[in-house]
Structures are given as C-alpha cells and as structure tokens.
From Swiss-Prot:
Major location (coarse): cytoplasm
A Gene Ontology BP annotation from the UniProt entry: 'de novo' cotranslational protein folding
EC category: isomerase
Classification via SUPFAM superfamilies: FKBP-like, Triger factor/SurA peptide-binding domain-like, Trigger factor ribosome-binding domain
Annotated protein name in UniProt: Trigger factor
Molecular function terms, GO-annotated: peptidyl-prolyl cis-trans isomerase activity; protein folding chaperone; ribosome binding
Residue ranges of every copy of the PPIase FKBP-type domain listed in the record: 163-248
Organism, as annotated: Geotalea uraniireducens (strain Rf4) (Geobacter uraniireducens)
Keyword entries, A-Z: Cell cycle, Cell division, Chaperone, Cytoplasm, Isomerase, Rotamase
Catalytic activity, reaction form: [protein]-peptidylproline (omega=180) = [protein]-peptidylproline (omega=0)
Family statement drawn from the similarity comment of this UniProt entry: Belongs to the FKBP-type PPIase family. Tig subfamily.
Source organism phylogeny: Bacteria, Pseudomonadati, Thermodesulfobacteriota, Desulfuromonadia, Geobacterales
Enzyme Commission code(s) on record: 5.2.1.8
GO annotation, cellular component aspect: cytoplasm
InterPro entries per record: PPIase_dom_sf, PPIase_FKBP_dom, Trig_fac, Trigger_fac_C, Trigger_fac_C_sf, Trigger_fac_ribosome-bd_bac, Trigger_fac_ribosome-bd_sf, Trigger_fact/SurA_dom_sf
Length: 433
C-alpha cells in the first residue's frame, strides 16, 4: 500500500491511498465468500451458489463491502502512522473498484491548527471604571415598591391611565364580522404593558368605569394568526372596573418588611453592595473578553469549520434552554436555527480561537490545574448553590465529563489571569470603550 499526504491548508490534509491489486483481489474473494453464506438464489442451497451467479446478482454489494473493509482498515492505520488527528469525519473520494487493478482513494480531513502563541505579554486592553449610579438604586427601590404594591378600586370619576389595571368586555370585528378569539368578558389589562395589539391600550386611556367605546386598530403584518395579519379591526369595549396601584411608602417600616433590615438606609446600603458586586463582575468579564480578543488579534489563524459548527450548535442549544426557562422560543425572538447560526457564526469562531490559544499558551507556559485548585472551586460552587460540599464533590467524582469541563474552565481562567498580570491595562470611562 502506498500513502501520500497532501497539506491543503494549515487545517486540512488529504491522504491519498493506492491499494495493490493483490490486496483488492483478496478482499473481493473474501467479500464473495461472506455473501455466499447468506445468498438466496432459487435452485441453490445457501453456501452453494456458483461465483458467476454471485457476480451477476451481488456485484454492487460486493463493491460496497470491499470499499468499506479496505477503507476501515487502511484509513485508521494511516492516521496513526502519519500522526494525523482529525477533528472532522473524512470526505472520501475513490476510483471505481476493478478486479485485477490497484484501487485508489483519498480521505480529506480537518485537523487542529498547530498554534504557537506569540506576542502575549504586554497586551493593551481597556478596563471600564466602576462608577456608582444613584439612579440604579432608586430604580431598584421602585421595583421593590412595585412588588409590594396592591390594587385598589379607583373612584368613579377616575380616568384610566398607564399603570392602571382595567377590567373590560370586548368584541372584535374584521370587515364587520366577528373572528375567533376576538371576544372576552372581564378581561383585565395593565395599561402600558404592551400586551394588546399596538394602539389598543392607548385608546383605553382616558375612559372611565361604565364607558362604552369603539377602538380601531390594525393587526401587525407579522401577527400570529395569518388570517388577521395586516387587517383593520374594530373592538366594542365596555369598561367595568379600574384599579390603581397603591405603592407602600419608602421608609424604615418598608425596609423592615424584607426581614434583615432595621432601616431604609440599611436597605439602600445592601442594594448598593449588590449592585457594586454585579457591576464589578460584569466589568471583569468584559475585560477578560477584550483581553482574549487582543490575543487573537496578535495571533490570527485558520479554524476548522467543524469546530466552529460544534461551538455554534452548543451555543444554539444553550440559547434554547435559556429561552425555555422564560417560556419563550427562538421563533418568538424572530429567529430560526439557520438564522441564529448565520448571525452568531463569527462569535462562535472567536470563542473557538480563544479556547485554542489559551490551551496552547497553557502548554507553552506549563500552566496546570492542581488538585487544590479543583477542591477550592468545588467548595465555591457548593457555597454559591447552598449545597453540601460532599454532595457537590460526589457529583464531580461520579461525572467524569463534568469534572473534565470544570478542569478545562479552571485552566482557561488561570491562563487569563497569567495574561492579565502581564497586560497593560488602561482604566477608562465606559464611553471610551
């Protein structure tokens, strides 16, 4: 057998094979021998069918079996002999199989790029300065007030406004005819929530209990019910009740309702502390992302499409899971699988490049994850999730893949810490990034 390896690019190799005619003949005889054991031809017992009839009826199956046997035997041996580590399935191209002649085929595969990281000290990156934002604290207190609010019936002369909860009956018509799902009684709607057709809530504003009115709207072109999309509609509405939201007063008693606080100042201090923690985590995450991007800019290289596709599929599945937790779907976000992959392909490529660079740098600088590092991380995970340390530790001991993933993440974190220690970091306002 003769083998020749072509480097088509830094990430793609083509292995050319030539199988001697003697080997081909041997495999053909072997294949017909196996076929004869099971061949059923009228007038002959199994195992007794003459070869000329086998050739006549089973030549295609013979060729398939021979190709499979030859390729399985020679392809994997060549990978080992030539030290080729593919990241993709092979693309096989072959000549027609002919008895008495040598057989040629090729296998094209993608391989990991040979990454040697350079210019990784002194990377220049910008870090956002943490700035305390009083408005964020006020907004959080407002949210807490909203969560502690209760509804009270409005007086008879109250005109509905955004934020009110209005109960009403409605009947909808398109072209003068009622439509499915276009009518309801005692329907409650928070004005300004945007839950209804655009323009509907705006026309409820200003109405009072007992008012009857006619509301005209146009269904959006992308409305879920295709038979209504883009059509004008008229709704007859009757206002039955208006409730206004009563917010608790912001004082020490309000703070005490949350259990651990004795005063409003203590509550504000806690909100500030949590906000600072979240903001600094965000700033640190974005700094690390910019650092990796700077490393990629200094060390650009080709990435196998297979690795990008794998990362894209992982990102897609994670996105679907996050949306499902919010009872949402990709379609609700205006995306399908293909559209998502087109939109986020460059992101996936950057993530793959970053991972390969960090892995290569870990080898170059002999950065390893010690048992103490892993133990400390497992303790951190247990504390964050309020779980027993033994439970979390057992999970990782019994799940090799989860432990491997955690170790890989820890190694990446250590490499990024190494880079940060040698980087030139410029703290700037957010507007300068």
């Amino acid at each position: 057998m003769r083998i020749n390896v072509e480097s088509l690019s830094s990430i793609k190799k083509k292995i050319n094979f030539e199988i001697p005619s003697e080997r081909v003949a041997s495999e053909v005889e072997k294949a017909y021998g196996e076929i004869r054991k099971h061949a059923a031809i009228k007038g002959f017992r199994k195992g007794k069918v003459p070869k000329d009839l086998l050739v006549k009826h089973f030549s295609d199956k013979m060729a398939d079996d021979v190709l499979k046997n030859i390729i399985n035997d020679t392809y994997f041996k060549a990978l080992m002999d030539e030290n080729i580590y593919p990241v993709s399935h092979p693309v096989i191209e072959s000549d027609e199989l002919k008895v008495g002649e040598s057989f040629k085929y090729s296998a094209t595969v993608e391989i990991f790029p040979d990454v040697v990281v350079k210019d990784y000290t002194g990377l220049e990156v910008k870090k956002e300065k943490y700035v305390f934002n009083e408005e964020v604290i006020a907004n959080r207190l407002k949210e807490m007030q909203e969560n502690m609010s209760h509804l009270e019936p409005a007086d008879a002369q109250h005109s509905a406004m955004n934020g009110d909860f209005v109960t009403f009956d409605f009947k909808g018509f398109v072209g003068g005819e009622p439509f499915d799902g276009g009518a309801a009684e005692d329907y409650q709607l928070e004005l300004g929530s945007g839950r209804f057709i655009p323009g509907f809530e705006d026309q409820i504003v200003g109405m009072k209990v007992g008012d009857e009115g006619e509301i005209k709207v146009t269904f959006p072109e992308n409305y879920g019910q295709k038979d209504l999309a883009g059509k004008e509609a008229t709704f007859a509405v009757t206002i039955k009740e208006i409730k206004v939201k009563e917010l608790p007063e912001l004082n020490d008693d309000f703070a005490k309702d949350f259990g651990e606080f004795e005063s409003l100042d203590q509550l504000k201090a806690k909100i500030s502390e949590v906000y600072a923690l979240q903001e600094n985590e965000r700033i640190e995450t974005e700094l690390r992302e910019r650092l990796i991007k700077a490393l990629i800019d200094k060390n650009n290289f080709e990435v196998p499409e297979t690795l990008i596709d794998k990362q894209l599929n992982l990102m897609l599945e994670n996105s679907k899971k996050r949306l499902a937790m919010q009872r949402l779907t990709m379609e609700m976000m205006g995306l399908n699988d293909e559209g998502y992959k087109i939109q986020f392909r460059s992101v996936a490529e950057t993530q793959v490049k970053g991972s390969l660079l960090l892995e290569a740098l870990a080898r170059q600088e002999s950065i390893q994850v010690a048992d103490d590092d892993l133990d400390a991380k497992i303790k951190e995970i247990a504390a964050q999730n309020n779980q027993e340390l033994e439970t979390v530790n057992n999970f990782y001991q019994q799940n090799a893949q989860a432990k491997e993933n955690l170790t890989a993440q820890l190694k990446e974190d250590k490499v990024v810490d190494f880079l940060l220690a040698k980087a030139k970091i410029d703290e700037v306002d957010r507007s300068e990034i």
